[in-house]
Amino acid sequence: DLFNPPGSLAWVTDLGFVPNLVRERIRKAQILVLESNYCPHMLEADNKRPWSLKQRIRSRHGHLSNHSTFELLNSYNSSCWQKIFIMHLSKDCNDVNLVCQQFKELNGQGNRFKTFVIDPLTAEPHLV
């Protein structure tokens, strides 16, 4: 909101894993923008990407999978989050509806934040 800006924003993409320092910093953010790049099954089935690229995507120097991102968010007992934006979804190896379905569980746990998934094709937010 322009007239009531958040105290802090964390923008976390292009990680193959989340170091402890990043884990601690994102806990304090009011707005969190986080990647959920690929579905492991869709990545494995993708015929366009060579094996070496798939290995890099899955590595510590690659991207976070849907499962990794969900587990990261689910691991916090408390945070300052007001809004979470899940983005940087692969157009070929992920699906907005799949991500929305998986992350619905976070909102069902009595959390006070809103979760949005950003469509990679339209850039539109989908409220989870």
Model-derived features: where do they sit?
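Cap/insert and terminal regions of metallo-dependent hydrolase folds
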Residues: 19-118
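Long, positively charged, glycine-interspersed low-complexity recognition regions
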Residues: 110, 119-128
